[in-house]
Amino acid sequence: VKSTQKRGFVVSRPVAWKPPGLTGYLNMFNDGLSYMGVVESVTLPKLTRKLEKYRGGGMPGSVSIDLGLDDDALSLEWTLGGLPDIELWAQYASPGADSVPLRFTGSYQRDDTGAISAVEVVMRGRHKEYDGGENKQGESGTTKISTECTYYQLTIDGKEVIEIDVINMVMKVDGVDRLAEHRKAIGL
């Protein structure tokens, strides 16, 4: 149900149901290097907000005050089959908070029409953890990489949906930079 507001009241009208897009294929790029056939799974950042409850005098309930991104809002986990290549190991303890460029690409297919959507998430950050897991003779094993990102850009079918740049104080949602006035107010 889609809602619109008229004279202070919310009016609901039915919206045609669409089945979810299912992941068709995915790939991960690390500093331009493709991990096709090697990457097994990707857990993209959750984009969580840090909210604090506030209840002032005369308020019958509390409201959530938005304090920006949660500390783990831009955390990424990705799993590779086998032992990672030297290029990935060389990024361990990278000196810059945004020194590792990553790119996730995925294709999602709708079940009703068969239409395919291209999804791209561009991220920059530094690796926090390399988890080699358990290794057994005769098995390929996996390595899980945890990356703390400072930059995140979500694009769906060529349209930028979200861009977050922690270092440069940018937060664009559907083309609107929600921090532009704050940057202006502090002289940036």
Give the positions of each predicted feature.
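N-terminal interaction modules that seed assembly of large macromolecular complexes
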Residues: 45-73
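Catalytic micro-motifs at enzyme active sites that drive phosphoryl/nucleotidyl and oxygen chemistry
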Residues: 64, 90-92, 109, 130-137
